[in-house]
Amino acid sequence: MADKKNLLLLFDHPTEPVFMDKGGNGTVFDVPASYVTDRYNKMCKKVQRRVSGGFEKNVLVKEIPIPDLSCSMRLGRSEQFSLFLESHRQMACHLIDVFIKMPTVDELQSVAVYARDRVNPVLFNYALSVAMLHRSDTKDLGLPAFAQIFPDRFIDSQMLRTMREESFVVERSAARLPVHSSVKYTASDLDVEHRLWYFREDLGVNLHHWHWHLVYPNTAPDRSIVDKDRRGELFYYMHQQIIARYNAERLCNHMARVQPFNNLEEPIAEGYFPKMDSLVASRAFPPRFDNTRLSDVDRPINQLRVGIDDMKRWRERIYEAIHQGYVLDANHKKIVLDDVKGIDILGNIIESSQLTPNKTLYGDLHNKGHILIAFSHDPTNKHLEYAGVMGDASTAMRDPIFYKWHAFIDNLFQEHKRQLSPYTEEDLTFPDVRVQSIQVESQGQVNRLTTFWQESDVDMSRGLDFVPRGHVLARFTHLQHHPFSYTIEVENSSEATRYGYVRIFLAPKLDDGNATMLLEQQRRMMVELDKFVVTMPPGSHTITRDSTESSVTIPFKRTFRNMDNPGEPQNFLCGCGWPQHMLIPKGRAEGLSFELFVMVSNYEDDKVDQKPEDCECSIAASYCGLRDRLYPDRKSMGFPFDRQPRSGSELLEKFLTPNMCSIEVIISHEARTEKIPELPDHS
């Protein structure tokens, strides 16, 4: 029986033939001759002996009849794969189906080995990842970080060249020096938007977006893979939180909040020049020039035709449905957009996913928007150009237009929320529970948080193909903050033990005009920091919580190499989640005022009825849910700020009920870089 961990080796060196050594220790797959492509059939064994020497491990691949893979092979191996293209999603769907239906790990390994050298490498990675996440016999395996397998999605082409040079010239891994990523490679200070480079081009931020769409695919052969609990609502909330965080960073950098891209006929003022090459396509990611205008896309090669008029029509139909309070399914039956399921239904319509009740009527608004922008430089394939970064889930967040587009998408969801009745004081109050005070403490400072720059390494060697083996480190400069802790004083004046759900949010106190922010604006900038359950016996007591325990983030070591434990494996079971180092906004050198909000709601009202089993993936549940389980909160995502405030609550202080509290927190930024000590050169 095959060791299922060997499946992880199939992700390594994605453009090299499958029979080449994998895993960094000379492991090779003993591939049946009928599985080897015609080009290498006669030389396979000779190449294995040459590149692996005395290889340590030989993985036997069982020869089985191979299912029809022709659908998934329609996309060439050197072409660009995009989840935003429906034709590509269907190809991936077919391959996922093949992988899912293999009855044993042995047979899954066999068909995956066969497919690997015949299917587009990124499509293969995506399909095998989704299948392994959803098969009962492989879902406990930790997938390798996407950045380690396809580093070209996360670093510029010059850095890639330098890493290849370091790998080729310096034979011993221990003697190789990290290759530094420049912080100024996509634009100069003349570009105002470049002030946000540390957010848009952050490794962890882009990995989060890719991994979320991996965990929540919008198309799959088995509907249950897509139809996860509150999936559409999660699409709304996760992206809404990205926009809230982005707007906070804009205020930190003396910039106005992002303007939604409402008029598709207006030029896109911001250009973007990614400076990245696709190793699979052997092409540069195309740039987009300032003031580019969108036009209808007609690309038969991509089975793609979408017009601006289509987008307008879908938008108007969605707005009409929101105002009517219902959508129509494919049989013209009404589905009510109520205050519980409405947002979930809209999420699947607007994205749109396989769960949309009527794609013919409501279209494919979000996905096609990405495509219109991604092909704006070559909408008819006249110049044989591939999509820009907006066409790939792992690169889209690098582009300033991503945030304008998603601000527009978020406005659709907010229009639905405006139709709902505001929460009353009774809805918000937790009888007999009072939050008496809150404070945060960091490095001996109270209610003051500090950010700075930090250098961290990622081993990219598994994605560097056709170069000598051994570790090759990429060194990134990223935002970081000192860890902090919350102290919450709570009083339970009843005579019984109560269970509370602590909800912590952060939002700027002042708007871009330096005026106190009205709650209707501020609620959309409320960034969720944490959510957890507490037990409250009668009387007063203190709740403490560390920032590293956040329910929205994944641990730092899951984004970057842990320098204290360099031998720690880089495969991680639960890669979905906001990066811990980006938990709080950057702030300003002189300090910037934020309001920290804490609410303790009644957990008896909020809890979800499901068995209290240990969940393998319980981190980052706020943005990513729980694997194979219901979302762990009955309230609407973003509660209590997902609806308009009640009358008389124009400011946050007037919104508060006794079980809430808010304080001012100052976030300061220190313009220093915490560097990693350079290792001595033993070459």
Curated annotation (Swiss-Prot):
The active site is at E351 (proton acceptor). PROSITE patterns: HEMOCYANIN_1, HEMOCYANIN_2, TYROSINASE_2. Upon activation, a trypsin type protease cleaves prophenol oxidase to yield the active enzyme. Its cofactor is Cu(2+). One of its GO terms (biological process) is melanin biosynthetic process. It catalyses: 2 L-dopa + O2 = 2 L-dopaquinone + 2 H2O; L-tyrosine + O2 = L-dopaquinone + H2O. It is found in: Secreted. Binds 2 copper ions per subunit. Disulfide bonds join C574-C617, C576-C624. Cu cation B binds at H366, H370, H406. Its EC number is 1.14.18.1. The keyword Isomerase does not apply. GO terms for cellular component: extracellular region. Belongs to the tyrosinase family. This is a copper-containing oxidase that functions in the formation of pigments such as melanins and other polyphenolic compounds. Catalyzes the rate-limiting conversions of tyrosine to DOPA, DOPA to DOPA-quinone and possibly 5,6 dihydroxyindole to indole-5'6 quinone. This is Phenoloxidase 3.
